[in-house]
From Swiss-Prot:
Record-linked InterPro entries: Atg3/Atg10
Functional note: E2 conjugating enzyme required for the cytoplasm to vacuole transport (Cvt) and autophagy. Required for selective autophagic degradation of the nucleus (nucleophagy) as well as for mitophagy which contributes to regulate mitochondrial quantity and quality by eliminating the mitochondria to a basal level to fulfill cellular energy requirements and preventing excess ROS production. Responsible for the E2-like covalent binding of phosphatidylethanolamine to the C-terminal Gly of atg8.
Record remark: domains: The N-terminal region is involved in phosphatidylethanolamine-binding and is required for atg8-PE conjugation. The flexible region (FR) is required for atg7-binding.
Keyword Transport attached: yes
Main localization category: cytoplasm
The protein's name: Autophagy-related protein 3
Region (Flexible region): 85-176
Family listed: Belongs to the ATG3 family.
Keywords for this protein: Autophagy, Cytoplasm, Protein transport, Transport, Ubl conjugation pathway
Length: 363
């Protein structure tokens, strides 16, 4: 079934009409030219990423330039598997987080009724510290009950023997081995970003390694995928740009455009709020404080630097230069199309939180 699905997906991308009209702001989709532009920006800003070509001319797609068929980064570390204890609270339901990149707290009022445009934050739904304090309080309040059901006096801490005063039985000590499963905990991944012509969005493929010379069996890659995404959003597919059958985990792009559109809208709203605050400032120093305090989505793509006042702006409030700055602010957007893949990787990291995507974005 997977072979048939991979084949149909590949031919659907190759035969779909190529769009040359930019609808980036309205739909979250990008054209092949915009994908190349965003890829060039990613490679420039983060040199761990690079462009790559298909393994043979027959595997190339016509709507992307030779040598720029896909993006690749290698040796991305993944230190832990996504078991029940990942991110702290075992057994918690995954929480839909709609405002992760806009600096929200993920509480009530931030989760919309349609979860398609959201993404998952694992194990963060409760205050683990508060639960721990309550549990300790219950442990401390241990009393005896007599036959009549009356509570006895609470034991004082002094009555409890100190475990450090007891001698350890060497034969009873269970020593933890370095590797109880027989499988090294550290894995590395090679990440590929391709362009899906049918969905008009990027698509991520992942290929894992147990060591530099030992590929990770494809089914074990699912251990590094958030549970709700396994075999649904993330499936095992053949990589279309390589000869032969090279299985990789792939994040299906069917919802990428709607998620990216949501991120764009939220980033623009955050930027508009910052603009409104700037209009109320009375001095350059006050404006600098507003810019430094602002976080959110626009901060991910160096918008703070673009918005900051340069040393050449020394005009007093009300001067021509100050008014020109405010006019320039009105023309800016939070996320430019060439910055698309930077935000895309931040979003896609929620599918594989154990893989250190930020490693690929170090300068």
């Amino acid at each position: 079934m997977n072979i048939l699905h991979s084949t149909l997906s590949t031919w659907r991308d190759r035969l779909a009409p190529v769009s040359r009209t930019s609808t980036f702001r309205n739909t979250g989709q990008i054209t092949p030219e915009e994908f190349v532009l965003a890829g060039d920006y990613l490679v420039y800003k983060f040199p761990t990423w690079s462009w790559a070509d298909a393994s043979s001319p027959a595997k190339r797609v016509s709507y992307l330039p030779d040598g720029k068929q896909f993006l690749v980064t290698r040796g991305v570390p993944c230190h832990r598997r996504l078991n029940d204890n990942f991110a702290g609270d075992a057994g918690l339901e995954d929480e839909i987080v709609r405002d992760f990149l806009s600096g929200g707290d993920g509480g009530e009022g931030t989760v919309a009724d349609d979860g398609e445009d959201g993404w998952l934050r694992t194990g963060g739904g409760r205050d683990a510290g508060a639960d721990h304090d309550k549990q300790e309080a219950r442990i401390r309040d241990v009393r005896t009950v007599d036959e009549s059901g009356n509570l006895g006096e609470q034991e004082e801490d002094d009555d409890i023997p100190d475990m450090e005063d007891e001698d350890d039985d060497e034969e009873a000590i269970i020593r933890e081995t370095d590797d109880q499963s027989g499988t090294p905990s550290l894995r590395t991944y090679t990440l590929y970003i391709t362009y899906s012509n049918f969905y008009r969005t990027p698509r991520l493929y992942l290929s894992g390694y147990l060591s530099p010379s030992e590929p990770l069996p494809p089914h074990l890659m699912m251990e590094d995928i958030v549970g709700d995404y396994k075999d649904k959003t993330v499936t095992l597919e053949d990589f279309p740009w390589f000869e032969g059958s090279v299985k990789m985990a792939s994040v299906h792009p069917c919802r990428h455009a709607s998620v990216m559109k949501t991120l764009l809208d939220r980033a623009d709203a955050a930027l508009k709020l910052r603009r409104d605050k700037l209009k109320q400032t009375q001095s350059r120093d006050e404006a600098d404080r507003v810019l430094r305090a602002g976080g959110g989505l626009e901060g991910l793509v160096d918008e703070t630097k673009n918005m900051s006042l340069g040393d050449s702006h020394h005009a007093q409030p009300g001067g021509d230069e100050w008014e020109m700055l405010q006019r320039d602010e009105e023309e800016q957007v939070a996320i430019r199309v060439d910055q698309y893949l930077v935000v895309f990787l931040k979003f896609i990291a929620s599918v594989t939180p154990g893989i250190e995507h930020d490693f690929t974005m170090g300068v």
